[in-house]
């Protein structure tokens, strides 16, 4: 069973590239790999294979990565060019984002049907417009419209919808419950993931 814990955030206390990369490879990547064995079957269908991509950080030469993740997409070659699901860490949060990055453009109709589906999601969710920034907004009809409109009109804007688990969230006291919640949210996001894939 995959158990993400508060101890995982200690990876980001390492201040050098070599040390942080070593900790990511030793501590987080094995958990991402194990998580993938559960999440891939939740997303794939008989008609559509899903592939996992653990961040490699190959372009890092000096500064340590501020975050790390595993992404799930319909492409075996990568994930940035297509809608995907990303599960990962910053130094103060775990995130699960359904993402359409700028590399997926131009795809003017990519968000078709997503707004109506998103507003029916149970529980608390977040939206954001930039995957390299921690900034996020609670999922409301107004915030969803704002992020969606920005995505459609600004070249570098992105679209992210999902769940962020801040390090001070009480759910971290029960790693089993956290992992169950992640799986439930993957299932909840799957219809939108499928719609985005169809739209592109």
From Swiss-Prot:
Q: Which InterPro entries match?
A: UPF0637 (IPR009403), UPF0637_domain_sf (IPR053707)
- Superkingdom, taxonomy of origin: Bacteria
Which Pfam families does the entry mention? DUF1054 (PF06335)
Q: Where is the signal peptide?
A: none
Annotated family: Belongs to the UPF0637 family.
Q: What is this protein called?
A: UPF0637 protein LCABL_14170
Top-level taxonomy: Bacteria, Bacillati, Bacillota, Bacilli, Lactobacillales
